[in-house]
């Protein structure tokens, strides 16, 4: 019998991102209770020695499974150390890989309160509204002018600790362009 290969998309991440992600998920499962119904599977509970953790997030009849891996091939940089993340959407026997942005949108849709378009009308009528989104990683689009005005009026409040974002987990913070802190003066006087 010949070998059968299965190909899947795995995002390379550094190990500190994986540790932070797991800590945030556990905090919101057990302390803040915002992640109700989520299931965390440890590395010793799986048959695959490459899996470091699995998080099962129910989405109605379907579920989102976020698997973190260790011991993969060495990464492009020394700090990657062969760590990776795969994101899978499952419903019945159907499975498909999805990207981090879509995963964040699905989590946002099912689990967290958000400012909706009808909230502008509710605010104008004097009814109470939810003026903020609990999970802003779930939608990146620019809001309407009314939404932006209401946000400016209410103000943005930071959450501690933040809610776990799949996009934040998979982003490559090491290969982003460096921001120059001081633009005053010429480059020659700043020693650049």
From Swiss-Prot:
The record marks 150-151 as: Cleavage in virion (by viral protease). It is found in: Host cytoplasm; Host cell membrane; Virion. Processed in virion by the viral protease. Residues 14-17, 74-79 are annotated as: Interaction with host APOBEC3F. GO terms for cellular component: host cell cytoplasm; host cell plasma membrane; membrane; virion component. The modification Phosphoserine is found at residues 144, 165. Pfam families: Vif. One of its GO terms (biological process) is viral life cycle. Residues 40-44 are annotated as: Interaction with host APOBEC3G. Residues 171-172 are annotated as: Membrane association. Induction: Expressed late during infection in a Rev-dependent manner. The keyword Phosphoprotein applies. Residues 151-180 are annotated as: SOCS box-like. A motif (BC-box-like motif) lies at residues 144-153. Residues 151-164 are annotated as: Multimerization. Residues 75-114 are annotated as: RNA-binding. The BC-like-box motif mediates the interaction with elongin BC complex. Homomultimer; in vitro and presumably in vivo. Interacts with viral RNA and Pr55Gag precursor; these interactions mediate Vif incorporation into the virion. Interacts with the viral reverse transcriptase. Forms cullin-5-RING E3 ubiquitin-protein ligase complex (ECS complex) by interacting with host CUL5, RBX2, elongin BC complex (ELOB and ELOC) and CBFB/CBF-beta. Within the ECS complex, Vif interacts directly with host CUL5, ELOC and APOBEC (APOBEC3F and APOBEC3G) substrates. Vif-defective viruses show catastrophic failure in reverse transcription due to APOBEC-induced mutations that initiate a DNA base repair pathway and compromise the structural integrity of the ssDNA. In the absence of Vif, the virion is morphologically abnormal. This is Virion infectivity factor. It comes from Simian immunodeficiency virus (isolate EK505) (SIV-cpz). The lineage of its organism: Viruses, Riboviria, Pararnavirae, Artverviricota, Revtraviricetes. The gene is vif.
């Amino acid at each position: 019998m010949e070998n059968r290969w299965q190909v899947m998309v795995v995002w390379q991440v550094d190990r500190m991102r994986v540790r932070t992600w797991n800590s945030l998920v556990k905090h919101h499962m057990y302390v803040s209770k915002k992640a109700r119904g989520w299931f965390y599977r440890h590395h010793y509970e799986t048959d695959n020695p490459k899996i470091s953790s699995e998080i099962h997030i129910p989405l109605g009849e379907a579920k989102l499974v976020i698997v973190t891996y260790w011991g993969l091939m060495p990464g492009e940089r020394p700090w990657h150390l062969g760590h990776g993340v795969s994101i899978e959407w499952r419903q019945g026997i159907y499975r498909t890989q999805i990207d981090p942005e879509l995963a964040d949108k699905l989590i946002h849709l099912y689990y967290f309160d958000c400012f909706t378009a009808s909230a502008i009308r509710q605010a104008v009528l004097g009814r109470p509204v939810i003026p903020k989104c609990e999970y802003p990683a779930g939608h990146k689009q620019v809001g309407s002018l009314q939404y932006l005005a209401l946000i400016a009026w209410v103000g943005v409040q930071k959450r501690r600790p933040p809610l776990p974002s799949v996009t934040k987990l998979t982003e490559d913070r090491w290969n982003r362009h460096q921001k120059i802190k001081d633009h005053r003066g010429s480059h020659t006087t700043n020693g650049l």
